[in-house]
Design a protein with these regions (language model features):
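C-terminal-biased regions
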Residues: 1-34, 38, 56-128
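Short extracytoplasmic/periplasmic juxtamembrane "stem" segments immediately C-terminal to an N-terminal membrane anchor
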Residues: 33-50
């Protein structure tokens, strides 16, 4: 009977830690999404420098959590988001200001961040 209680306690601990991970990841990606959305608004106001600063801040925030992210998530997903951040920064810091191309790259990055959280949710689709 003791083994049963220990097994149940371990399962509950793992479920709790998984929930904590999803909660933390959701908060983290929400912060990044907020910064990138603000950057998009800066581009609409033709403040490319402000948008670049906000996007760099989002990238630095991402890099600060890279150890945690590599421990808990798929490496391909993490690398794809980092590449997308670099692409968005290239549009912002490039000599030619291309708002449509920037908007498309930024939208793709925002979608990748959203999908990152969705992939961690304990849904039937993710379990199968």
């Amino acid at each position: 009977m003791r083994r049963l209680y220990l097994s149940a306690a371990l399962i509950l601990l793992l479920a709790g830690l998984s929930g904590l991970h999803v909660w933390h990841l959701n908060g983290f990606t929400s912060q990044l999404t907020g910064l990138l959305t603000q950057a998009q608004q800066q581009v609409r106001q033709e403040n490319w420098t402000g948008a670049a600063l906000l996007t760099r801040e989002a990238k630095e925030h991402w890099m600060d959590h890279e150890g945690y992210l590599h421990t808990t998530l798929h490496h391909d997903d993490i690398d794809a988001i980092l590449i997308s951040m670099d692409e968005v920064l290239a549009f912002l810091e490039g000599g030619e200001k291309q708002p449509a191309e920037y908007a498309a790259a930024n939208a793709r990055l925002l979608t990748q961040l959203e999908l990152l959280v969705e992939a961690e949710l304990p849904t039937l689709t993710n379990l199968l």
